[in-house]
Amino acid sequence: MAKQVRKTGKKKEKKNIPEGIAHIQSTFNNTIITITDPIGNVIAWSSSGMQGFKGSRKSTPFAAQMAAEDCVKKAKEHGLRKVQVYVKGPGSGRESALRSLQAAGLTISLIRDVTPIPHNGCRPPKRRRV
Protein backbone atom coordinates (compact mmCIF):
# COMPACT_ATOMS: atom_id res chain seq x y z
CA MET A 1 0.00 0.00 0.00
CA ALA A 2 1.33 3.45 -0.94
CA LYS A 3 2.24 5.92 1.77
CA GLN A 4 0.60 9.33 1.75
CA VAL A 5 3.06 12.04 0.85
CA ARG A 6 2.78 15.24 2.84
CA LYS A 7 3.13 18.53 1.04
CA THR A 8 6.23 20.44 2.08
CA GLY A 9 5.15 23.70 0.46
CA LYS A 10 4.68 27.06 2.10
CA LYS A 11 1.55 27.36 4.25
CA LYS A 12 -0.58 30.49 3.87
CA GLU A 13 0.02 32.81 6.80
CA LYS A 14 -2.89 34.66 8.38
CA LYS A 15 -1.78 38.27 8.37
CA ASN A 16 -3.61 41.00 10.24
CA ILE A 17 -3.98 43.82 7.72
CA PRO A 18 -6.78 46.29 8.58
CA GLU A 19 -6.14 48.61 5.60
CA GLY A 20 -5.28 47.82 1.99
CA ILE A 21 -5.55 48.77 -1.68
CA ALA A 22 -8.04 47.21 -4.13
CA HIS A 23 -6.94 47.27 -7.77
CA ILE A 24 -9.77 46.73 -10.27
CA GLN A 25 -8.51 46.07 -13.79
CA SER A 26 -11.45 45.96 -16.16
CA THR A 27 -10.68 45.15 -19.80
CA PHE A 28 -13.06 44.44 -22.68
CA ASN A 29 -12.62 40.69 -22.09
CA ASN A 30 -12.23 40.18 -18.32
CA THR A 31 -12.19 41.86 -14.90
CA ILE A 32 -9.39 41.20 -12.41
CA ILE A 33 -9.60 42.37 -8.78
CA THR A 34 -6.45 42.32 -6.66
CA ILE A 35 -6.30 43.38 -3.00
CA THR A 36 -2.87 44.30 -1.66
CA ASP A 37 -1.46 45.68 1.57
CA PRO A 38 -0.29 49.35 1.53
CA ILE A 39 3.20 48.29 0.40
CA GLY A 40 1.87 46.31 -2.57
CA ASN A 41 2.10 42.68 -1.43
CA VAL A 42 -0.90 40.69 -2.70
CA ILE A 43 -3.37 39.53 -0.04
CA ALA A 44 -6.13 38.17 -2.30
CA TRP A 45 -7.09 38.22 -5.96
CA SER A 46 -9.88 36.99 -8.19
CA SER A 47 -11.11 37.34 -11.75
CA SER A 48 -14.26 36.73 -13.75
CA GLY A 49 -12.69 33.72 -15.45
CA MET A 50 -11.73 32.27 -12.07
CA GLN A 51 -15.43 32.31 -11.10
CA GLY A 52 -16.25 29.92 -13.93
CA PHE A 53 -17.36 32.41 -16.58
CA LYS A 54 -16.03 31.63 -20.05
CA GLY A 55 -15.81 33.60 -23.27
CA SER A 56 -17.92 36.72 -23.65
CA ARG A 57 -19.64 36.18 -20.27
CA LYS A 58 -16.37 37.11 -18.49
CA SER A 59 -16.78 40.73 -19.54
CA THR A 60 -20.24 41.19 -17.98
CA PRO A 61 -20.90 43.34 -14.90
CA PHE A 62 -22.36 40.32 -13.07
CA ALA A 63 -19.12 38.36 -13.52
CA ALA A 64 -17.16 41.33 -12.14
CA GLN A 65 -19.51 41.48 -9.14
CA MET A 66 -18.98 37.78 -8.38
CA ALA A 67 -15.20 38.17 -8.66
CA ALA A 68 -15.20 41.16 -6.28
CA GLU A 69 -17.31 39.32 -3.69
CA ASP A 70 -14.95 36.32 -3.82
CA CYS A 71 -11.89 38.56 -3.45
CA VAL A 72 -13.37 40.40 -0.44
CA LYS A 73 -14.24 37.10 1.23
CA LYS A 74 -10.60 35.97 0.93
CA ALA A 75 -9.26 39.34 2.10
CA LYS A 76 -11.52 39.51 5.17
CA GLU A 77 -9.82 36.35 6.47
CA HIS A 78 -6.72 38.52 6.86
CA GLY A 79 -8.65 41.16 8.83
CA LEU A 80 -9.16 43.70 6.04
CA ARG A 81 -11.73 46.43 6.78
CA LYS A 82 -10.75 49.58 4.86
CA VAL A 83 -9.56 49.95 1.25
CA GLN A 84 -8.45 52.50 -1.29
CA VAL A 85 -9.74 51.59 -4.76
CA TYR A 86 -7.70 52.06 -7.94
CA VAL A 87 -9.73 51.46 -11.10
CA LYS A 88 -8.01 50.80 -14.42
CA GLY A 89 -9.40 50.11 -17.88
CA PRO A 90 -12.47 50.73 -20.07
CA GLY A 91 -14.45 47.54 -19.33
CA SER A 92 -18.05 47.12 -18.26
CA GLY A 93 -17.19 45.60 -14.87
CA ARG A 94 -15.74 48.75 -13.28
CA GLU A 95 -18.82 50.11 -11.55
CA SER A 96 -20.35 46.81 -10.48
CA ALA A 97 -17.08 45.57 -8.97
CA LEU A 98 -16.74 48.82 -7.03
CA ARG A 99 -20.34 48.59 -5.77
CA SER A 100 -19.93 45.01 -4.64
CA LEU A 101 -16.73 45.91 -2.72
CA GLN A 102 -18.81 48.42 -0.78
CA ALA A 103 -21.78 46.06 -0.37
CA ALA A 104 -19.50 43.33 1.03
CA GLY A 105 -18.78 45.52 4.05
CA LEU A 106 -15.48 47.20 3.20
CA THR A 107 -15.05 50.90 3.96
CA ILE A 108 -13.85 52.74 0.84
CA SER A 109 -11.63 55.69 1.69
CA LEU A 110 -10.54 56.70 -1.83
CA ILE A 111 -11.48 55.96 -5.44
CA ARG A 112 -8.89 56.78 -8.08
CA ASP A 113 -8.97 56.18 -11.85
CA VAL A 114 -5.51 55.08 -12.97
CA THR A 115 -6.37 54.18 -16.58
CA PRO A 116 -3.24 54.70 -18.70
CA ILE A 117 -3.77 57.34 -21.40
CA PRO A 118 -1.34 57.28 -24.35
CA HIS A 119 0.31 60.48 -25.55
CA ASN A 120 -0.18 59.23 -29.13
CA GLY A 121 1.45 55.85 -28.55
CA CYS A 122 0.48 52.62 -30.31
CA ARG A 123 -1.92 52.53 -33.23
CA PRO A 124 -5.41 51.51 -32.00
CA PRO A 125 -7.15 48.42 -33.41
CA LYS A 126 -9.21 48.89 -36.58
CA ARG A 127 -12.93 49.68 -36.35
CA ARG A 128 -15.29 46.67 -36.28
CA ARG A 129 -17.75 46.36 -39.15
CA VAL A 130 -20.71 44.32 -37.92
Swiss-Prot record:
GO terms for molecular function: rRNA binding; structural constituent of ribosome. It comes from the Bacteria. GO terms for cellular component: ribonucleoprotein complex; ribosome. InterPro entries: Ribosomal_uS11 (IPR001971), Ribosomal_uS11_bac-type (IPR019981), Ribosomal_uS11_CS (IPR018102), Ribosomal_uS11_sf (IPR036967). Located on the platform of the 30S subunit, it bridges several disparate RNA helices of the 16S rRNA. Forms part of the Shine-Dalgarno cleft in the 70S ribosome. Part of the 30S ribosomal subunit. Interacts with proteins S7 and S18. Binds to IF-3. This is Small ribosomal subunit protein uS11. The gene is rpsK.
